[in-house]
Every structure is written in structure tokens, then in C-alpha cells.
UniProtKB/Swiss-Prot annotation:
Function: Catalyzes the ATP- and formate-dependent formylation of 5-aminoimidazole-4-carboxamide-1-beta-d-ribofuranosyl 5'-monophosphate (AICAR) to 5-formaminoimidazole-4-carboxamide-1-beta-d-ribofuranosyl 5'-monophosphate (FAICAR) in the absence of folates.
Co-factor: note: Binds 1 Mg(2+) or Mn(2+) ion per subunit.
The organism's place on the tree of life at top rank: Archaea
Top-level EC class as recorded in UniProt: ligase
GO molecular function, one term: ligase activity, forming carbon-nitrogen bonds
Keyword Ligase: yes
Cofactor: Mg(2+); Mn(2+)
Species annotation: Sulfurisphaera tokodaii (strain DSM 16993 / JCM 10545 / NBRC 100140 / 7) (Sulfolobus tokodaii)
GO biological process assignments: 'de novo' IMP biosynthetic process
E.C. no: 6.3.4.23
Family: Belongs to the phosphohexose mutase family.
Annotated protein name in UniProt: 5-formaminoimidazole-4-carboxamide-1-(beta)-D-ribofuranosyl 5'-monophosphate synthetase
């Protein structure tokens, strides 16, 4: 049995964990990255593709002896339409990819889960506070911008249209910009063990907004929000019960709205305010790149497993547990 994934995002962690759990490993990656990935001895086979259709062909070569692990690059670059052509079984719920590609559906799901979310504005004319405008898909913050009022919001939206980053204003989501500390809560929902695990917390490091603090206040540069890295974090323990409650609510709602439900890793991307409120502004329905911080396990995964347990390894551990209990079909779609 092969564990395979796309060469990007969190692929090193995923395949490192798969090898630790005794699986063969394979990677499908753009041709220009083949040399880089071949240096890692835990990757058994590396396939370079010229275009996304060829990537799907390589993935489908493993239809009878492989399991594909999805991550953000599969969602964003291979795309939901091509994912529908993938015959190889996918770990997790592939039906969730369509929801993740649509910002409005994502927020609707969070609202249904009774999770606190930022105020949203359907019409730029209604903006009366600081807002952030987000593009669809898993773009790592590319194209996102902050606006202080409706005038700045409309100006920024017109630029996105001119640059063809969006086709319609209906594609974006306009959210209140919540002031606080960003915290991205990483979970794993185990179908086999019937439990939800908090796997870690990270903070995204974004350019250029995180570099602007080093400049004098009188230098005016428009901030951008492109994710380039991640910083580890732990939360006040008193926050964790609410974090866990939100995770449970999310799992229950996905089971109801997106059958067969939440399988494996996901992330609730949040801001913690000075009042201790946790406001969730987005979710990822698969492994997130912030888990790369914890290849040797996080402060939280150690509490569940008492051994090094990355999210990548946790995925393969779940697959192994499913195989051993004859429940593999319950964790694949």
C-alpha cells in the first residue's frame, strides 16, 4: 500500500509520517521540484508532471494500491473539477473540497455550527468598520486586502477585477477585521477511535504585513497578507474547553451537511480577542501547512500519544488502525 500526495504544502511531513508507520510512499510534483524531493530517503517514488492533467494521471496510476492524502495545493492548484476525476481513494472527505473553495459556503457552515464568526457584509456600500476582503480557494492570503471604509473596499475590489483575480464581486467575502491575536487551531477527528484530538496551534507569518512593524510609522506602504511561514503557539489552558467545543460543533455540522462527515485533520482559523472571545474567520477541511512546525509532535499531540506524532504521521496511524480493524472504507472517499 502506497501513501501518496502532491509535492508541496505539507508533503514532506505527510510522507515522513507515512514511512514511520511502515507504508511505501510516492510523490507527484511539478517537474522543476523533482530534484529537491529526491534527496529525501523516506520518499520511495517521485513523479514529475508537466501540467495538472498529467498529475491526475499519475495519481490514478495508484488507484488499486494507493491512498492520496489531500492538502491545500490539491484544493487550490489541481482544483475541485480535476479532483472529481481522481479514481485513487482519498483519505478524508473529498466532498468538503467544494465547500473549502467557496468562502460563502465556508462561513455558512461555521455559522450553522454555532461557532462565533466575524460580521459579514454582502454589499460594499454597507461597510461601516475595518474589514478584510478575501478571495475564494486556498490561496494562502494572496490577493486579500484590508480596507478602512467602503471607499477603500470598492477601490480594492475594482483592482481585483482589473487584474482578473476575480470575475465578480460575488466571489469574495467581506468580513469585519477582528482585532486580536490570530491562532489557528489544528484538530484530528478520528473515525476509528471515535474521538477528537487537538493536534497543535500555529500563527501564520504573512508578508508584508508582519514586516511593516519594523518601519517608521510615517512610511506608508499598503499591507499584503501572503502567508510565507508559520510560528508555533500554545494557548492559555482556560481557552481550550471552548476551542474543543468549537471543534466538536464543527465535526457534528460537517456530518450533517457534508456526508460522510469530517474525517481526519482540519483547522479552525481564529482570532482571540482581549476579552477571551474566540472568533473563527475560516476553516480548512484537511491538513494545514502550520502542522509542519510539529514533525516531532506538538505540546498537544504528546498528551494524546506520548510519542512523536505529527499530523502527517497521525493520518497514516489512522489508516493503519483502519486496516487492522477492517474499517478502511470508513476513512476514504
Amino acid at each position: 500500500m502506497y501513501i501518496l500526495t502532491i509535492g508541496s504544502h505539507s508533503s514532506l511531513q505527510i510522507l515522513h509520517g507515512a514511512k514511520k508507520e511502515g507504508f511505501k510512499t510516492a510523490l507527484v510534483t511539478p517537474e522543476k521540484r523533482v530534484k529537491f524531493y529526491k534527496q529525501f530517503t523516506f520518499i520511495d517514488e517521485v513523479y514529475g508532471y508537466k501540467n495538472e492533467d498529467e498529475a491526475v494521471d499519475y495519481i490514478n496510476d495508484f488507484a488499486n494500491n494507493g491512498i492520496l492524502i489531500p492538502h491545500g495545493s490539491l484544493v487550490e492548484y489541481i482544483g475541485p473539477e480535476r479532483v472529481n476525476k481522481i479514481k485513487t481513494k482519498i483519505f478524508g472527505n473529498r466532498n468538503l473540497f467544494e465547500w473549502e473553495a467557496n468562502q460563502k459556503k465556508k462561513m455558512s457552515l461555521l455559522k450553522s455550527a454555532k461557532i462565533k464568526i466575524p460580521e459579514q457584509f454582502e454589499n460594499p456600500e454597507d461597510i461601516d468598520r475595518l474589514v478584510i476582503i478575501k478571495l475564494p480557494g486556498a490561496k494562502g492570503g494572496k490577493g486579500y486586502f484590508i480596507a478602512r471604509n467602503k471607499s477603500e473596499a470598492k477601490e480594492g475590489l475594482n483592482k481585483l477585477l482589473e487584474q482578473k483575480m476575480i470575475r465578480s464581486i460575488d466571489e469574495v467575502i467581506i468580513q469585519e477585521y477582528v482585532i486580536g491575536v490570530p491562532m489557528y487551531f489544528q484538530f484530528f477527528n478520528s473515525i476509528i477511535l471515535n474521538r477528537l484530538e487537538i493536534m497543535g496551534i500555529d500563527i501564520r507569518y504573512e508578508t508584508n504585513i508582519d514586516g511593516l512593524r519594523r518601519l517608521p510609522a510615517d512610511i506608508k506602504i499598503d499591507p499584503t497578507l501572503v502567508v510565507v511561514g508559520n510560528i508555533p503557539a500554545v494557548a492559555r489552558e482556560s481557552l481550550l474547553p471552548l476551542v474543543y467545543e468549537y471543534g466538536e460543533n464543527f465535526v457534528n455540522t460537517v456530518k450533517e451537511l457534508v456526508p460522510p462527515g469530517m474525517i481526519g485533520p482540519f483547522c479552525l482559523e481564529s482570532v482571540v480577542t482581549d476579552q477571551g472571545d474566540i472568533v473563527v474567520f475560516e476553516f480548512s477541511g484537511r491538513i494545514v501547512a502550520g502542522t509542519n512546525l510539529y514533525v516531532n509532535g506538538s505540546p498537544y499531540s504528546w498528551l494524546y500519544w506520548d510519542e512523536p506524532m505529527s499530523v502527517g504521521r497521525r493520518i497514516s496511524r489512522e489508516i493503519k488502525l483502519a486496516i487492522n480493524s477492517n474499517k478502511l472504507e470508513q476513512v476514504l472517499t
